[in-house]
């Protein structure tokens, strides 16, 4: 704060030991003149010519103060102009905030993301191919196991038929053995019969001719042949029946196997298609999840980047606003100081004019003789009563006013 009140210019002087100093030398101040003594030029302190010296000193002091105030006003004006030029230059030179160019990095990131997505799709395609190969291997393994089961069933059926054929062969052998035994028995019976007939003939000779009406003999060969034919027909019939049954069972089993194989093939094909569809959907779902994650990460990074940029811009705006506020405050303060200085200058010029008018209007002159009884105005001055210029009582020091009247309103 500036206190532009003038210092107390009242001369706090005690009466000197010079002879005949009047007792009316108490310091008084001019009203509204910042404690400028009013008895300057009227009280004969230092005889004739002291008024001119005090006036010169006062005027010199006031001129120096006025020159210093004017110099300070000019300095403040220069500082204000310099600040205004700096503000203008700063506002002209300040470039808008340019965000760094990350387009090349973004393009590189996009290319890398595309490569990653291509690699992921290629990996997914390879995984699908591997799964398809595994499914095809499973299908071939299932077919192999099915064919192996069918082969085992056919082999078991063939073994069963072979056992039946062996049993039939054994039965045929038994029947052939029985036929041979019956043939041998028939031969034995025939030979025994012929022997008996020959024996009887030899005993009876020709004496007896017996004619016996008997049933015609049975042809055993024919009977055996018929029996053989019947058994062979029966065996052939049984064999044909068994073969027909086997063929029917085999055809039915083949039909069932074919239908089951077709159903199994269709089911396996459908399962393979469904698995492929599921794998493709899983791959697509994984790709969508990855895309969503990448987009979320990109969104998060973008939000973070733009929030950081926004914070930087806000901080820059805050700094600029604070600088502008400080500059405005400085400008207002300097304007106020400048205004105060202008007011002080005007007040000082007014006071100087007042002092000059007072000094010019002073028509009383100091006497040349310090012990004169009259002054230039013809007024009587009381002579010194004391003996050879004894020192008078000390003058009461000038009590300064509590405040300067004209300058009080400018004290900050």
From Swiss-Prot:
Residues 203-218 are annotated as: Linker 12. Residues 102-202 are annotated as: Coil 1B. The modification N-acetylserine is found at residue 1. Residues 219-362 are annotated as: Coil 2. Pfam families: Filament (PF00038). The keyword Methyltransferase does not apply. The record marks 304 as: Stutter. Belongs to the intermediate filament family. There are two types of cytoskeletal and microfibrillar keratin: I (acidic; 40-55 kDa) and II (neutral to basic; 56-70 kDa). The low-sulfur proteins, derived from the microfibrillar fraction of wool extracts, are composed of two families, each consisting of 4 homologous subunits: the type I components (8C-1, 8C-2, 8A and 8B) and the type II components (5, 7A, 7B, and 7C). This is Keratin, type I microfibrillar 48 kDa, component 8C-1. It comes from Ovis aries (Sheep).
């Amino acid at each position: 704060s500036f206190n532009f009140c003038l210092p107390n210019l009242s001369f706090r002087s005690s009466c000197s030991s010079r002879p005949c100093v009047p007792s009316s030398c108490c310091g008084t101040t001019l009203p509204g003149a910042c404690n400028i003594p009013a008895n300057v030029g009227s009280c004969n302190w230092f005889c004739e010519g002291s008024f001119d010296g005090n006036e010169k000193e006062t005027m010199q002091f006031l001129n120096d103060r006025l020159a210093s105030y004017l110099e300070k006003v000019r300095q403040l004006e220069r500082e204000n102009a310099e600040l205004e030029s700096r503000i203008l230059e700063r506002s002209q030179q300040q470039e808008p905030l340019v965000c760094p160019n990350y387009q090349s990095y973004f393009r590189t990131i996009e290319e890398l993301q595309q490569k990653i997505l291509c690699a992921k799709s290629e990996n997914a395609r390879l995984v699908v191919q591997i799964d398809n190969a595994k499914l095809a291997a499973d299908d071939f393994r299932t077919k192999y196991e099915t064919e192996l089961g069918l082969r085992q069933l056919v082999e078991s059926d063939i073994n069963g038929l072979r056992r039946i054929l062996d049993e039939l062969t054994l039965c045929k052998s038994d029947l052939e053995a029985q036929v041979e035994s019956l043939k041998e028995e028939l031969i034995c019976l025939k030979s025994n019969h012929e022997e008996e007939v020959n024996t009887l003939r030899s005993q009876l000779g020709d004496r007896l001719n017996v004619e016996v009406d008997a049933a015609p003999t049975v042809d055993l060969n024919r009977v055996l042949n018929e029996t053989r034919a019947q058994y062979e027909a029966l065996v052939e019939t049984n064999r044909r029946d068994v073969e027909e049954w086997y063929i029917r069972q085999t055809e039915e089993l083949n039909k069932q196997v074919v239908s089951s194989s077709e159903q199994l093939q269709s089911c396996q094909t459908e399962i393979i298609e469904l698995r492929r569809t599921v794998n493709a959907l899983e791959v697509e779902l994984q790709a969508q999840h990855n895309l969503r994650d990448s987009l979320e990460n990109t969104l998060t990074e973008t939000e973070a980047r733009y929030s950081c940029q926004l914070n930087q811009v806000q901080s820059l705006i805050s700094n600029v606003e604070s600088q502008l506020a400080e500059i405005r405050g400085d400008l207002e303060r300097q304007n106020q100081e400048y205004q105060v200085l202008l007011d002080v200058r005007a007040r000082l010029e007014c006071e100087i004019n007042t002092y000059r008018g007072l000094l010019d209007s002073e028509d009383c002159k100091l006497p040349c003789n310090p012990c004169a009884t009259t002054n230039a105005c013809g007024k009587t001055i009381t002579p010194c009563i004391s003996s050879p210029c004894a020192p008078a009582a000390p003058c009461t020091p000038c009590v300064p006013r509590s405040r300067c009247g004209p300058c009080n309103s400018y004290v900050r």
